[in-house]
């Protein structure tokens, strides 16, 4: 990834429109995730679902482009109205008005919208030979991912989601794995 295109750009402030400071904080964070910017820059090659999630992703992409076009102050009024509309449509009253809210809750909401806008069915194949216990663990993690996300995969999973691995080892033999589990 060529980070030079970001040098001295994206130094844009967001004007507070009511109690939107939690939204503005989240937008600044998302705007400076270069992996997300790369994905958004290549959206023309992706099919965006034509629903409320697609609306919010499209509106975010427009605002993001404006934020990176020149260093200035932007009032994200249209984006906030789209968030309120989508929030009401999803029966999520939390972001449907002008009440103060928690930035982390909004971040989960917006990431979920992005994922649902891009999700699609994919064919996930796992190849290779298991040579050691680490390979075996990796295979079980990939198998879990294949089962969970083959019908609704998006690149958002690659950027924002991880895998939690729990390993229980033998007390007598540290090399003996009694159990392991992989969870998203």
Regions found by a protein language model. Name each.
Residues 1-184:
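Deubiquitinase catalytic domains
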């Amino acid at each position: 990834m060529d980070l030079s295109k970001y040098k001295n750009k994206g130094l844009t402030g967001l004007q507070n429109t009511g109690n939107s400071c939690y939204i503005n904080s989240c937008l600044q964070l998302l705007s400076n995730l270069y992996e997300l910017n790369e994905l958004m820059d290549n959206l023309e090659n992706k099919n965006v679902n034509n629903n409320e999630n697609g609306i919010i992703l499209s509106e975010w992409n427009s605002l993001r482009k404006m934020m990176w076009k020149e260093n200035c102050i932007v009032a994200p009024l249209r984006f906030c109205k789209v968030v309120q509309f989508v929030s009401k449509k999803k029966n999520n009253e939390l972001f449907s008005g002008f009440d103060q809210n928690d930035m982390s809750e909004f971040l989960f909401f917006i990431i979920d919208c992005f994922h649902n806008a891009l999700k699609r069915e994919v064919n996930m194949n796992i190849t290779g030979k298991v040579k050691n216990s680490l390979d075996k663990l990796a295979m079980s993690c990939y198998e879990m991912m294949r089962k969970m996300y083959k019908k609704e995969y998006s690149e958002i999973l690659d950027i924002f989601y991880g895998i939690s691995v729990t390993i229980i080892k033998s007390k007598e033999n540290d090399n003996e794995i009694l159990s392991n589990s992989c969870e998203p």
